[in-house]
Amino acid sequence: MSEIKLIVGLGNPGDKYADTRHNAGEWLIERLARRFNFNLSVESKFSGKTARAVISGQEMRFLVPTTFMNLSGKAVSALANFYRIPPEQILVLHDELDFSPGIAKIKQGGGHGGHNGLKDIIAQLANNKNFYRLRIGIGHPGDKNLVASYVLNKPSPTDRQLIDRSLEEATDCIEILMKEGITKATNRLNAFKA
């Protein structure tokens, strides 16, 4: 049933960044790995950690680029090209400044909104913006000059709790996506607020 064949979780590599807001996409992949019992392993030809799982009879590939965020497109395009997965069958999980913690939404297409990971993915997919995005709200520092340090810092315990609740709902919705399709998953997730 799933129209999605590749799920990508964005983040920066290394322990220094593991708990920072910019790694919210990777946090969601980690939850999916626990839910669906798969392990990511490093595949250097894809510049990332990858896994393959069959869920509800659907083959799904998972990717966490091991490059820094602004080079995420290299991994996405390498894996998508190798397995002939078109952009319309890719779901990218990423942090979203424009949503408060506790909100997550799915959408298809659009620009990068200043997100350097999305910017590079769009560029590496030959400017094709038609991939899906699951945007995980992390809140905004209020001043655009503070954004760079904000995304590279840990959320407050209260914000982390709200983000975790949205990640739990997103995990449920990705399971729905695999069984019943992206429209049903989108409608449910986009109505959720922790």
Swiss-Prot record:
It catalyses: an N-acyl-L-alpha-aminoacyl-tRNA + H2O = an N-acyl-L-amino acid + a tRNA + H(+). It comes from the Bacteria. InterPro entries: Pept_tRNA_hydro (IPR001328), Pept_tRNA_hydro_CS (IPR018171), Pept_tRNA_hydro_sf (IPR036416). The record marks D95 as: Stabilizes the basic form of H active site to accept a proton. The keyword Cytoplasm applies. Pfam families: Pept_tRNA_hydro. Signal peptide: none annotated. The active site is at H22. TRNA binds at Y17, F68, N70, N116. Keywords: Cytoplasm, Hydrolase, RNA-binding, tRNA-binding. It is found in: Cytoplasm. The keyword tRNA-binding applies. One of its GO terms (biological process) is protein quality control for misfolded or incompletely synthesized proteins. Its EC number is 3.1.1.29. GO terms for cellular component: cytoplasm. Monomer. Belongs to the PTH family. NCBIfam families: pth. Hydrolyzes ribosome-free peptidyl-tRNAs (with 1 or more amino acids incorporated), which drop off the ribosome during protein synthesis, or as a result of ribosome stalling. This is Peptidyl-tRNA hydrolase. The gene is pth.
